[in-house]
């Protein structure tokens, strides 16, 4: 399931919430849906962490470049 795009995972999570809120959804179905939702949430959380790490890395790199350029101009 790790291959699913983030947006698709979020869309499926919304579908699961809708299904679980239906009175006609059985307990067994709700449990299966909950398990699927748990797996999807883990995937989404992992993708968000990776994106945050990448943004932090790019920001640090940009800041290092700016500091280096400022030092060059100061000399």
Swiss-Prot record:
One of its GO terms (molecular function) is exodeoxyribonuclease VII activity. Bidirectionally degrades single-stranded DNA into large acid-insoluble oligonucleotides, which are then degraded further into small acid-soluble oligonucleotides. Keywords: Cytoplasm, Exonuclease, Hydrolase, Nuclease. Heterooligomer composed of large and small subunits. Its EC number is 3.1.11.6. One of its GO terms (biological process) is DNA catabolic process. The keyword Nuclease applies. It is found in: Cytoplasm. Pfam families: Exonuc_VII_S (PF02609). It catalyses: Exonucleolytic cleavage in either 5'- to 3'- or 3'- to 5'-direction to yield nucleoside 5'-phosphates. It is an enzyme of class 3 (hydrolase). Signal peptide: none annotated. One of its GO terms (cellular component) is cytosol. It comes from the Bacteria. This is Exodeoxyribonuclease 7 small subunit. Belongs to the XseB family.
